């Protein structure tokens, strides 16, 4: 019966991240630096609110867009955090995680033949949805521009078929962010064009040395903002996302959302209400720890002689391994088998990720030290072997 399936569904592949994770699971004594979620527990006060909701039997369907009380709290929370304002009743939707928000947004705005401009390297979760919509992903090489999708790069990629530009910043896998001036330049370029911006800001509370800016501040009428609590409050399993869009767009996204999931979990929504009401600074402790880890990891990688752009957000770093003359998959497999360290091959993040590996520092300092010690020894041995070959020995 498989041949009767939608060809586009059959053509979708399991993400490179998941494929490599399955290989890692077959090995023992592995230091895994692949994880894409916080290594902190959900704050106690958030868990307590969920327990209270369970005890009070808050287990029914909610409004499709989510509890109004939660949407109102999210409106105030994001107005303080990101300096943009969407109406709680008509422009905010509570979704089953940020991924479902992205899915609902794309299914609403894309038609067959449309083009979606995205930076490469990029998280692999966008492309399959775009393909399922019959649209075309247009991945732009940003490796020579500090991994940033600039206004100039967007302008060069624009065609009459362009329907959307994806701005996933802070970035997974590179950790880079866009400055206020860079966002203003993009907004000036796109303003008045028949082009949406999907701004995925799920890592917005994990920025270092500079504040996070949202393009919605400068291009509100064309922007769909995706956010949530997975990274800011360590709530990946609670599946709570936020979608913000102008009301004439949001009302149609809401229909797609309704027929997909009806509503986000009632218990998770009550936990989210507590998070955005009384957990305004919950991300601070995590951010401080991530910053210490980032500085340590960056310094270690530089000391190894690896070419790397220092991230300004998220909890990933994306060093180049091109000097070793290996594909990112072969390098990662050799590192796994010879040193017991797992990094994600850069090829998992589009063809423009080839020649890089993703390292997550969402783990303890002890784990990072051991993993980087092993990586350093592996790098030294690889270079010695290359030198021996070059010397004709």
Curated annotation (Swiss-Prot):
The record's subcellular location field reads: Cytoplasm
Q: Which domain of life is it from?
A: Bacteria
Q: Tell me, what is one Gene Ontology molecular-function annotation carried by this entry? A: transaminase activity
EC number(s) recorded for this UniProt protein: 2.6.1.-
**Metal-binding: present as a keyword of the record?**
no
Among CDD domains, the record links this protein to: AAT_like (cd00609)
Q: Main subcellular localization, coarse class?
A: cytoplasm
Q: Which UniProt keywords apply?
A: Amino-acid biosynthesis, Aminotransferase, Cytoplasm, Diaminopimelate biosynthesis, Lysine biosynthesis, Pyridoxal phosphate, Transferase
- What cofactor does this one take? pyridoxal 5'-phosphate
A GO biological process of this protein is: lysine biosynthetic process via diaminopimelate
- Show the catalytic activity: N-acetyl-(2S,6S)-2,6-diaminopimelate + 2-oxoglutarate = L-2-acetamido-6-oxoheptanedioate + L-glutamate
Identify the pathway: Amino-acid biosynthesis; L-lysine biosynthesis via DAP pathway; LL-2,6-diaminopimelate from (S)-tetrahydrodipicolinate (acetylase route): step 2/3
A cellular-component GO term for this protein? cytoplasm
The subunit structure is: Homodimer.
Sum up the protein's function in the record's words.
Essential for murein biosynthesis. Probably catalyzes the conversion of L-2-acetamido-6-oxopimelate to N-acetyl-LL-2,6-diaminopimelate.
Question: Which PANTHER family would you find in this protein's record?
Answer: AMINOTRANSFERASE (PTHR46383:SF4), ASPARTATE AMINOTRANSFERASE (PTHR46383)
Task: State the family it belongs to.
Answer: Belongs to the class-I pyridoxal-phosphate-dependent aminotransferase family.
UniProt-recorded name of the protein: Probable N-acetyl-LL-diaminopimelate aminotransferase
Q: Report the source organism.
A: Bacillus subtilis (strain 168)
């Amino acid at each position: 019966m498989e041949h009767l399936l939608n060809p586009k569904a059959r053509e979708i592949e399991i993400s490179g991240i998941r494929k490599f994770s399955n290989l890692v699971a077959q090995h023992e004594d592995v230091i895994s630096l692949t994880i894409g979620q916080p290594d902190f527990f959900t704050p106690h006060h958030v868990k307590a609110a969920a327990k209270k909701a369970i005890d009070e039997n808050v287990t029914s369907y909610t409004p499709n867009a989510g509890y109004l009380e939660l949407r109102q709290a999210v409106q105030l929370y994001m107005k303080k955090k990101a300096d943009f304002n969407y109406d709680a009743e008509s422009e905010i939707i509570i979704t089953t995680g940020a991924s479902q928000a992205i899915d609902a947004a794309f299914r609403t705005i894309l038609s067959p033949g449309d083009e979606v401009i995205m930076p490469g390297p990029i998280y692999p979760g966008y492309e399959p949805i775009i393909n399922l919509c019959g649209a075309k992903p247009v991945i732009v090489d940003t490796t020579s521009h500090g991994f940033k999708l600039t206004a100039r790069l967007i302008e060069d990629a624009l065609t009459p078929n362009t329907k959307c530009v994806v701005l996933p910043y802070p970035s997974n896998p590179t950790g880079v962010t866009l400055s206020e001036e860079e966002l203003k330049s993009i907004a000036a370029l796109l303003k008045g064009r028949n082009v949406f911006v999907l701004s995925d800001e799920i890592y917005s509370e994990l920025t270092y040395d500079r504040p996070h800016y949202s393009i919605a501040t400068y291009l509100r009428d064309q922007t769909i903002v995706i956010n949530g609590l997975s990274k800011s409050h360590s709530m990946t399993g609670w599946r709570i996302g936020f979608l913000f869009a102008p009301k004439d767009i949001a009302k149609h996204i809401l229909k797609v959302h309704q027929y997909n999931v009806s509503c986000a979990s009632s218990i998770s929504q009550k936990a989210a209400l507590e998070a955005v009401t009384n957990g305004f600074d919950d991300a601070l402790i995590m951010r401080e720890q991530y910053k210490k880890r980032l500085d340590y990891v960056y310094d270690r990688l530089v000391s190894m002689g690896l070419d790397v752009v220092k991230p300004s957000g998220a909890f990933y770093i994306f060093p180049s391994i091109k000097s070793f003359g290996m594909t990112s998959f072969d390098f990662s497999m050799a590192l796994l088998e010879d040193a017991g360290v797992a990094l994600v091959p850069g090829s998992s993040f589009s063809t423009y990720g080839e020649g890089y590996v993703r390292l997550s520092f969402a783990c303890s300092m002890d784990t990072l030290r051991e993993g980087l010690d092993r990586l350093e020894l592996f790098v030294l041995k690889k270079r010695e072997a290359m030198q021996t070959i070059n010397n004709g020995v």
